[in-house]
């Protein structure tokens, strides 16, 4: 499940090349059409119709186009969540059961807030201590986490600005930096 097509979110795709060998089928990918276009362009060799030279030569991928409607993956309902990654770019977060994953965001649109209620776990972007144009900074992320009210919040997509131990020691109860 892809959130968006930035390099730090799709460039590891080639590392999946052996997974189809063990799975016995192509690796299913779930993404919006714009992300699919970026994947097909960036990893064109993975979609080449010529036979591969050996089992791990190229990743075998099966792309499933999604939007913000709920879908079922491996018997579990997944709800894609619309998020803003700066003023002009939209990405997806995901809610799976009582867990929500919301990274690369600095704004949660009004229509997404109701889907963040009743969470056990919130995984939320908190890039650094200083404000950023396209990511929540830590203070913004704490405010969002408090508004969501999940039992536990893990901050992710962290820069090297943080002293892990010192920052965790100063966070509100139920909130911590992820690794």
Regions found by a protein language model. Give the residues of each.
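Binuclear metal-dependent hydrolase catalytic cores
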Residues: 1-102, 111, 168-179
């Amino acid at each position: 499940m892809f959130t968006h097509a930035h390099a730090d979110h799709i460039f590891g795709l080639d590392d999946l090349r052996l997974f189809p060998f063990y799975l016995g089928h192509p690796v299913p990918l779930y993404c919006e059409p714009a992300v699919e276009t970026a994947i097909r362009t960036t990893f064109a060799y993975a979609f080449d119709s010529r036979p591969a030279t050996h089992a791990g030569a190229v990743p075998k991928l099966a792309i499933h186009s999604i939007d913000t409607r709920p879908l079922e993956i491996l018997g579990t309902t997944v709800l894609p969540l619309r998020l803003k990654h700066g003023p002009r770019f939209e990405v997806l977060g995901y809610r799976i059961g009582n867990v929500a994953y919301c990274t690369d965001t600095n704004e949660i649109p009004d229509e997404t807030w109701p889907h963040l209620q009743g969470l056990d776990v919130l995984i939320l972007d908190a890039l650094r201590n200083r404000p950023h144009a396209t990511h929540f900074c830590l203070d913004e992320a704490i405010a969002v986490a408090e508004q969501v009210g999940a039992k536990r919040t893990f901050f992710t997509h962290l820069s090297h600005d943080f002293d892990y131990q010192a920052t965790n020691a100063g966070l509100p109860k139920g909130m911590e930096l992820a690794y």
